[in-house]
Every structure is written in structure tokens, then in C-alpha cells.
């Protein structure tokens, strides 16, 4: 061991002057009593708070902390599951920019069906995926034009897989109503219609405003409104157009592609759709030109016919059919349906559930009225009424020349015709006989046609009602009488041909007492030369047509046996036929008026 007092170098050498090598102990600081008795005025004198505590509003603080925590969790869920629509609306161009291509999400073919939690989350994620599409910003907000960039709308339309569905969705978003709720669908592009509803997407503002003036030369009524990127047109063209023609007009006028257009005809019998157009033109954002179409006015505008349109008047239908001389059910139904756009009662009939019942009853009533009117008329009044219904003028000489061509004395024929028309007993039947192709049927048919007579057919003789048409006419024709028919007439019809009363069996009625009307016969057999029918010789007046009917070089009849010719014939020979003057038919001072069968009030509107 070395000596500690030896003078060698040590590790503490050189620290003696400026560094304390040992701590100085003080006995004073070790006394705890003196330490606490010192002055307590120091920096940590208030470290312990011995004052009385208050409760405070700890419940409100806890509620605030819970709300902040819930809001934070909700924001995390929104960022995870909701689409970035809000960000896209702030900057759609920036959102459309992508540095890396999007990869399609892959679906697992065989997912594990364990607890269902993962499957539920996947389904929710798939349902939310279609909402990622960025909607275009409207270029004309608040029904007013704007100067937005239409390229945005083109891009949004091109990005959609179903362009028609996209346009319909944007239409409903803009106008608040579906496009199909205002229109009816035409599947064919060639079907013509005068009224069209056209919706156009992303139209330039200048072209949109100019179309309001340019379309006036093509349409009777225009309804135009633009909301956002969608423009809606109701066009009532002056002539019917198909969808292709309408698209060609719109594309050339608005400089748009056909894929930007939706076009269908409007619903004409939908009150809600009519109110949409009617109330829409009252706003400041819509433009309209021309009078309302009839289908809008009838459903929205109240008038003096509104109360009548809701109820059907059967008597008005019967009155219409009577004046138009319609007796068949099919003719009444078709013609009255065509009258619907002009007549309110026809519209009410179309809306009724018992249309067929009304048509049948209308035909019955018209037949009853016509039959009663015919029985009330004399033969002079009947002929006068029927020839006045013939339009046009002819010449009576054609009939006279044809009678003379058949070697018949015209004075004798005129005398027989006068007695025939007045139903003189034993002179009530005229027979025209001769070889075939002599004009017998043509002559007889022309007379029956102008006087609205009835034709009998012996083919129905097996029925006991085959003579029923004789009770519904003023003159009748039995064409081409053969031996079986002569035998039947000689057996059963002697009294009828004499002009006496007979009992006629009619369907659904008891036998009727009546006289046969003037009966015109045509036959190839001269009954006056047959001894078997000698009892008919005194009741039938016969005229022979021996010559063939003459024809011109162009195969047209040489003698025109038309309604106009018979009209001129009766007018010219009215006095010779002993027909009464129609001005002397009624009583003096009696007013002549048309037949009225409708329950029309005296104080109704004109």
C-alpha cells in the first residue's frame, strides 16, 4: 500500500480551489421543529387547498363530453360509408380528376356465411355504391337562365350507363314530377300525333331563349320552362308529326344530340296532368304562346257546359240519331263516338259503363219514331220528304226515254203509277216482266231506293215473319218472282194484293191488322199468260220490258236511273200523279216545326 501522505499525482489533483469535495453539514437544519416554525411565505405555500368544496354542474359537463364523443363517432361513420357528394358539389372538376385508374371492386364467389355481420356490411356497402355518381350543377338555377358550362352536363350524361333513366331522374329532380306521369308512351317512332311533350337536357341559354320564338311558326300552342339543366316543352303542332320529325326539328333548332331528348305525347284525359300545364304557365319562369288546347281547357277551365258534361242525356242521343237517320246500332255507336270532341253529351256517354245498353235502346226508339212518323204521313208528304233529301239535280227525261225504249205507252204507265201510289184496290200491284238483262231490277231498285222502300226476299218464306217489312214502309219490292213464289202468292196473298186488310204476323207482337203498301214485282214470267194464276190477273198490272238494257261504248248505262232523275221526275209530274200540294196539307195558321224527342228545357243556353 502506498502512503497517503506521499507526494504523488492523484485523480483529485487540481480541484481544490473551485470545486467542493465534501458537503458541509449543519446541525440547525436537522431540527424539524425549527423548520416548521419558520416563515411559511414561499412559492408552494398554497399547494394544498383546505377550503370547502362546492358540487357545481358536473352533470352538464358529462353530457357535453358524451355529445362530443358521439359526434366524433358519427363523423367517422359518415366518412366511412357515405358518398363524397358534398365534396363533389364544391368542386366537380377537381373530383373528376384522377391520377390513377379506378379498379373495379371484386366480389367473392363463395362468401362465408357465418354470423352474418360481415355479409351485412358488404351489402350495405354495395347498396351505397351507385350514389358515388357526381350530379351536374344546374346552369339555370331558380327558373332563371345562367351561363354555366354545359360541358359538365355532357360529361355526366356520357358517364351514365342508362341515359334514358338518367334523364328521367334529372327531370324528376328538376320539376318534382315524373316524366311518365305527364305523358303516355308511343312505342313506334312512326306514330303521328299533334301534341308532344319534349324534355331536353343541357341546352345552351341563347338557343333556349330563341326557341320560344322559332317554334311559334310550327305550333298553335307552346309551353316552355327551364329549371336547371332540364328544359321542358309542350308543343301543339299545326299538323301531326311523328317522333322522328319532332327530334329532327329540336336537334336542328337547339343544336343538341338526340340522346339528350325525351319525347312522348301528353296524357289527354288526366286531370292532374292538365293542371300541371295549366298552373305551370301562371308562374314567372314559364313561357306560353297561343290559346289553351281543348284537352287542357275542358279539364281545367269552368264554363256553362261543365254541369252538363257530367251527366248523360239519353233523349239528346235519340234526337241526334233521329235527325241523322241512323237506325243500326253499329252506325249509332261509331258516329256518336266520333262526335265526342264536339259534344259534351257524347263525352258523358263514352264515360258511362252502359254504352251498349244505351245504343240498343237508342236504335229501338229511333225505329219507333220513324215508324210513327211514316204512318202519320200521306203518300204525297212521304214522296215530297224523300225527294227533298236528294242532293243534286237530274233530268226526268231519262226515265221517260227508258220507258218508251221498252215500247211502253208513257201515258198508260203514268196512269198505272198514279193508281199504284195511291193504293187503289185492284191497282195496288205492278209487275215488270221480260227476258233477263232488260233492266227490270235496275228500274225497280232505283224507284225503291229514292222512296226509301223495303225489299222482300222469298228465300225467307219458311219464316212466318218474312212479310214483316211490309208494316214498316210506304212502298215495297219483291224481286225476281219465280213459280214457287207465284204459287205462294196465289195461295195466301190474294187479299193483300187486292188492297184489303189482312192479318200480318210480326215478331214479338200480336198479329197486326193492316193493308199492304204498293207492291212492285219483277219476274221473267208473264203471269197474265199463265192460266194457273188466273185469279191474280185482275189484281196485278203488268208491263213488259222486251229490249236489253242499252249501254254506252265506255260500258256505262245510256239511261241514268238515278235518285236525281227520279227527283226531277216526281217534281215535273207532281200534278199528273195527283199528289197533293204540301202547303195545303196542314191546317191554316199551323206552324211547321221539326220533330223534337229530347227533354230540352226552354231556358237553356243557345
From Swiss-Prot:
Residues 408-558 form the SF3 helicase domain. Gene3D superfamilies: 3.40.1310.10, P-loop containing nucleotide triphosphate hydrolases, Zinc finger, large T-antigen D1 domain. Pfam families: PPV_E1_C, PPV_E1_DBD, PPV_E1_N. Residues 146-309 are annotated as: DNA-binding region. Residues 593-606 have a biased composition (Polar residues). Its EC number is 5.6.2.4. ATP-dependent DNA 3'-5' helicase required for initiation of viral DNA replication. It forms a complex with the viral E2 protein. The E1-E2 complex binds to the replication origin which contains binding sites for both proteins. During the initial step, a dimer of E1 interacts with a dimer of protein E2 leading to a complex that binds the viral origin of replication with high specificity. Then, a second dimer of E1 displaces the E2 dimer in an ATP-dependent manner to form the E1 tetramer. Can form hexamers. Interacts with E2 protein; this interaction increases E1 DNA binding specificity. Interacts with host DNA polymerase subunit POLA2. Interacts with host single stranded DNA-binding protein RPA1. Interacts with host TOP1; this interaction stimulates the enzymatic activity of TOP1. This is Replication protein E1. It comes from Human papillomavirus 5. The gene is E1.
Amino acid at each position: 500500500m502506498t502512503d497517503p501522505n506521499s507526494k504523488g499525482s492523484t485523480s483529485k489533483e487540481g480541484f481544490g480551489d473551485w470545486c467542493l469535495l465534501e458537503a458541509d453539514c449543519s446541525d440547525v437544519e436537522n431540527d424539524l421543529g425549527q423548520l416548521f416554525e419558520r416563515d411559511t411565505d414561499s412559492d408552494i405555500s398554497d399547494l394544498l387547498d383546505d377550503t370547502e368544496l362546492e358540487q357545481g354542474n358536473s352533470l352538464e359537463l358529462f353530457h357535453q363530453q358524451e355529445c362530443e364523443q358521439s359526434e366524433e363517432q358519427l363523423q367517422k361513420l359518415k366518412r366511412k360509408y357515405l358518398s363524397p357528394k358534398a365534396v363533389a358539389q364544391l368542386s366537380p372538376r377537381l373530383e373528376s380528376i384522377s391520377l390513377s385508374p379506378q379498379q373495379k371492386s371484386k366480389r367473392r364467389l363463395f362468401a362465408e356465411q357465418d354470423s352474418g355481420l360481415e355479409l351485412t356490411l358488404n351489402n350495405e356497402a354495395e347498396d351505397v355504391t351507385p350514389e358515388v355518381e357526381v350530379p351536374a350543377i344546374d346552369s339555370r338555377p331558380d327558373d332563371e337562365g345562367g351561363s354555366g358550362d354545359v360541358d359538365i352536363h355532357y360529361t355526366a350524361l356520357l358517364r351514365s350507363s342508362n341515359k334514358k333513366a338518367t334523364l328521367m331522374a334529372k327531370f324528376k329532380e328538376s320539376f318534382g314530377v315524373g316524366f311518365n306521369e305527364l305523358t303516355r308512351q308511343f312505342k313506334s317512332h312512326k306514330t303521328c300525333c299533334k301534341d308532344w311533350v319534349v324534355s331536353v337536357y343541357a341546352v345552351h341559354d341563347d338557343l333556349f331563349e330563341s326557341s320560344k320564338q322559332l317554334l311559334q311558326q310550327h305550333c298553335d300552342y307552346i309551353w316552355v320552362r327551364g329549371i336547371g339543366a332540364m328544359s321542358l316543352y309542350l308543343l301543339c303542332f299545326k299538323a301531326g308529326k311523328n317522333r322522328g320529325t319532332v327530334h329532327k326539328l329540336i336537334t336542328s333548332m337547339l343544336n343538341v344530340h338526340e340522346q339528350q331528348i325525351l319525347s312522348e305525347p301528353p296524357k289527354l284525359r288526366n286531370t292532374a296532368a292538365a293542371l300541371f300545364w295549366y298552373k305551370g304557365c301562371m308562374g314567372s319562369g314559364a313561357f306560353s304562346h297561343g290559346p289553351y288546347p281543348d284537352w287542357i281547357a275542358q279539364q281545367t277551365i269552368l264554363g256553362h257546359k261543365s254541369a252538363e258534361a257530367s251527366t248523360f242525356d239519353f233523349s239528346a242521343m235519340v234526337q241526334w240519331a233521329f235527325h241523322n237517320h241512323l237506325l243500326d246500332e253499329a252506325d249509332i255507336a261509331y258516329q256518336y263516338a266520333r262526335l265526342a270532341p264536339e259534344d259534351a253529351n257524347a263525352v258523358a256517354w263514352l264515360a258511362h259503363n252502359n254504352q251498349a245498353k244505351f245504343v240498343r235502346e237508342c236504335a229501338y226508339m229511333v225505329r219507333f219514331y220513324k215508324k210513327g212518323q211514316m204512318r202519320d204521313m200521306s203518300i204525297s208528304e212521304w214522296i215530297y220528304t224523300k225527294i227533298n233529301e236528294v242532293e243534286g239535280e237530274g233530268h226526268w227525261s231519262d226515265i221517260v226515254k227508258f220507258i218508251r225504249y221498252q215500247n211502253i205507252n208513257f201515258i198508260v204507265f203514268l196512269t198505272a203509277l198514279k193508281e199504284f201510289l195511291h193504293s187503289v184496290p185492284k191497282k195496288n200491284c205492278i209487275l215488270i216482266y221480260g227476258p233477263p238483262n232488260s233492266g227490270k231490277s235496275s228500274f225497280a231498285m232505283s224507284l225503291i231506293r229514292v222512296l226509301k222502300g223495303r225489299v222482300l226476299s222469298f228465300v225467307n218464306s219458311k219464316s212466318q215473319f218474312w212479310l214483316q217489312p211490309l208494316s214498316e214502309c210506304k212502298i215495297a219490292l219483291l224481286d225476281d218472282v219465280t213459280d214457287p213464289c207465284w204459287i205462294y202468292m196465289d195461295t195466301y196473298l190474294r187479299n193483300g194484293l187486292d188492297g184489303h186488310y189482312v192479318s200480318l204476323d210480326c215478331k214479338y207482337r200480336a198479329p197486326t191488322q193492316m193493308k199492304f203498301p204498293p207492291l212492285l214485282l219483277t219476274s221473267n214470267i208473264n203471269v197474265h199468260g199463265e192460266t194457273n194464276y188466273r185469279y191474280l190477273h185482275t189484281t196485278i198490272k203488268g208491263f213488259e220490258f222486251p229490249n236489253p238494257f242499252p249501254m254506252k261504248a265506255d260500258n256505262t248505262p245510256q239511261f241514268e236511273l238515278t235518285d236525281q232523275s227520279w227527283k226531277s221526275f216526281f217534281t215535273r209530274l207532281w200534278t199528273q200523279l195527283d199528289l197533293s200540294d204540301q202547303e195545303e196539307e196542314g191546317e191554316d195558321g199551323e206552324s211547321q216545326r221539326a220533330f223534337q224527342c229530347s227533354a230540352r228545357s226552354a231556358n237553356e243556353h243557345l
